[in-house]
Each structure stands twice: as C-alpha cells, then as structure tokens.
Swiss-Prot record:
This is Protein PsbN. One of its GO terms (cellular component) is chloroplast thylakoid membrane. It comes from Ginkgo biloba. GO terms for biological process: photosynthesis. It is found in: Plastid, Chloroplast thylakoid membrane. May play a role in photosystem I and II biogenesis. It is a single-pass membrane protein. Belongs to the PsbN family. Signal peptide: none annotated. InterPro entries: PSII_PsbN. The keyword Plastid applies. The lineage of its organism: Eukaryota, Viridiplantae, Streptophyta, Embryophyta, Tracheophyta.
Length: 43
C-alpha cells in the first residue's frame, strides 16, 4: 500500500474512535457523572 493510503486510513480510524468515545461519554455509563448546569441554576 502507498504511504498516503496508510495515513488516510489511520487518520480516519482516529476520527471514528474519537467520535465513538465522545458518544460513549455523552450517552453511555460515564454520563451519570456529568453535571447539568441548567438544572443547578433555575431562575
């Protein structure tokens, strides 16, 4: 394989991994530990 193909595949894999981790943090089990600033400051 060419170098450009390997670089493109590795960058794509990194972006997909980061997106998956962000979705897991936002909606998965760790989301229970996140605080909601809008609920804390009711006006």
């Amino acid at each position: 394989m060419e170098t450009a193909t390997l670089v493109a595949i590795s960058i794509s894999r990194s972006l997909v991994s980061f997106t998956g981790y962000a979705l897991y943090t936002a909606f998965g089990q760790p989301s229970e530990q996140l605080r909601d600033p809008f609920e804390e400051h009711e006006d």
